[in-house]
């Protein structure tokens, strides 16, 4: 199943990256925009994208404003928040009734502290596919886990136990503005050709070798709140684990990158 789902995603990625003649590509782009009801008001017009993948990975035409208050935590992406809560004995929910162990997702040996609050951000095919820093960060490590590329939509989350843990993913291990541990996990999915990270081009996902590896950064890579960390090549999921924060009531709400979703308490 791993080989099949990953192979399908690689094939889809190759097709999506193909540049058809402009008049054909414009029609393909227009159909995709219509099917998924994509709002292009913040982006270049659809005829500017030379491939479907270029449309998937579109950048904002101009910088989107965000809350620059130091203790504000912002949404890292445009997404639907499907679950959010404090960890319960290291358990988090991929969706209601489907728990998994948080330490397994991020690659730790020991259970995570119940002080961690987690948020699941589901990026659908219509969403802006880039992900950004939710606060000022020092990135210590990028842990890349080989795995399946199963869909991460709600029917699949209800059907497949430990889906996030079993799927290919990259877990960023970082320090937040207060020096507390923070995890930022990008989870792969079916038809997501790649997950890209701007701060390290060596990170390879959906590769044929199915390698699990870690990249350590000494000194840490410093990024500012709102900095573009990378992108999916279609929709997928970000899981954020943070400590010492107060979050708004977010479950089943759609958020936009830059929107304030909580704040860090003073240490």
UniProtKB/Swiss-Prot annotation:
Is synthesized initially as an inactive proenzyme. Formation of the active enzyme involves a self-maturation process in which the active site pyruvoyl group is generated from an internal serine residue via an autocatalytic post-translational modification. Two non-identical subunits are generated from the proenzyme in this reaction, and the pyruvate is formed at the N-terminus of the alpha chain, which is derived from the carboxyl end of the proenzyme. This is Phosphatidylserine decarboxylase proenzyme. Catalyzes the formation of phosphatidylethanolamine (PtdEtn) from phosphatidylserine (PtdSer). The record marks 235-236 as: Cleavage (non-hydrolytic). The gene is psd. The modification Pyruvic acid (Ser) is found at residue 236. Its main location: membrane. The lineage of its organism: Bacteria, Pseudomonadati, Campylobacterota, Epsilonproteobacteria, Campylobacterales. It comes from Helicobacter pylori (strain Shi470). Its EC number is 4.1.1.65. One of its GO terms (biological process) is phosphatidylethanolamine biosynthetic process. HAMAP family: PS_decarb_PSD_B_type1. It is found in: Cell membrane.
């Amino acid at each position: 199943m791993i080989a099949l789902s990953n192979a399908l995603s690689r094939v889809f990625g190759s097709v999506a990256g193909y540049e058809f003649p402009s008049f054909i590509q414009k029609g393909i782009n227009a159909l995709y925009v219509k099917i998924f009801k994509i709002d292009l008001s913040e982006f270049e017009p659809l005829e500017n994208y030379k491939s479907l993948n270029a449309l998937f990975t579109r950048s904002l035409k101009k910088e989107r404003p965000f809350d620059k208050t130091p203790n504000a935590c912002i949404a890292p992406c445009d997404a639907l928040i499907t679950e959010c809560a404090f960890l319960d004995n290291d358990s988090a929910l991929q969706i209601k009734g489907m728990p998994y162990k948080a330490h397994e997702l991020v690659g730790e040996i020991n259970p995570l502290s119940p002080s961690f609050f987690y948020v699941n951000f589901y990026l659908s095919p219509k969403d802006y596919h880039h992900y950004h820093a939710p606060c000022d960060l020092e990135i210590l490590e990028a842990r890349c886990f080989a795995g399946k590329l199963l869909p991460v939509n709600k029917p699949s989350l209800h059907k497949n136990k430990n889906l996030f843990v079993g799927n290919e993913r990259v877990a960023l291990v970082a320090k937040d503005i207060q020096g507390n541990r923070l995890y930022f996990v990008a989870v792969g999915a079916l038809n997501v050709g790649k997950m890209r990270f701007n701060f390290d081009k060596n990170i390879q996902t959906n590769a044929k070798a199915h390698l699990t590896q870690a990249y350590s950064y000494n000194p840490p890579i410093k990024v500012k709140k709102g900095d573009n960390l990378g992108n999916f090549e279609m929709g997928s999921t970000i899981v954020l684990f943070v400590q010492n924060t107060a979050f708004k009531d977010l479950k089943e709400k759609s958020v936009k990158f830059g929107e304030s979703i909580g704040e860090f308490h003073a240490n």
